[in-house]
Design a protein with these regions (language model features):
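Oxyanion-binding and handling regions
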Residues: 1-42, 50-56, 89-127
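Short glycine-rich anion-binding loops that position phosphate/pyrophosphate groups of nucleotides
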Residues: 13, 66-67
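Short, active-site-adjacent cap segments at secondary-structure transitions
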Residues: 69-70, 101
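DPxDG-like acidic metal-binding loop motif
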Residues: 60-65, 71-89
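A generic structural signal for short
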Residues: 32, 68-69
Length: 127
C-alpha cells in the first residue's frame, strides 16, 4: 500500500504537485506555463521542505505518464528517477486519463483499482 507520496503531474496542462503525508493531502499548482528541470526540482524541494517531509524507503513518487507534453513528461520522469536513485524510494506511474480530478479521493481510487503501475516507464507523448 502506498501511504506517504509525492505525485507529479507535469504534462503541459494544469501542472501540479500533490503530497500526501500523515493522511493529509496538499496541492501545489505551478505558476509558470513551461516547466524546466531546475524549476521542478526547486518546486519539489520547497514543497517538501514546507511540509517537513523526509524522503526514505517508505516514501513513494507517482508520476503522470501522459499523454502530454514531451518535455514536461521527460522532465518529471528524470527528476523522479533521480530521487528514486538518491533516496531509495519507490516510483509509480499513471495515465492522465485515469485520474479524473487531481485530489486525494481520486488518487486513492487509482490505487484501489490498480491503475498505478510499478513497471515504469512507458510515457505517452503528444506530438
Amino acid at each position: 500500500m502506498i501511504n506517504n507520496f509525492l505525485i507529479i503531474s507535469c504534462i503541459g496542462k494544469d501542472d501540479k504537485l500533490g503530497l500526501r503525508i500523515n493522511k493529509e493531502f496538499f496541492v501545489y499548482k505551478y505558476e509558470k506555463k513551461e516547466i524546466s528541470r531546475e524549476s521542478l526540482v526547486f518546486y519539489i524541494q520547497n514543497f517538501l521542505k514546507s511540509h517537513k517531509v523526509k524522503l526514505d524507503e517508505k516514501f513513494s513518487i507517482i508520476v503522470n505518464q501522459g499523454p502530454g507534453s514531451f518535455s514536461g513528461t521527460r522532465i518529471s520522469l528524470a527528476v523522479a528517477k533521480g530521487l528514486v536513485i538518491s533516496k531509495k524510494i519507490r516510483l509509480y506511474g499513471y495515465k492522465d486519463e485515469d485520474l479524473l480530478e487531481f485530489n486525494l479521493k481520486n488518487i486513492e481510487i487509482l490505487m484501489k483499482n490498480k491503475l498505478i503501475e510499478k513497471k515504469l516507464i512507458k510515457p505517452i507523448y503528444l506530438s
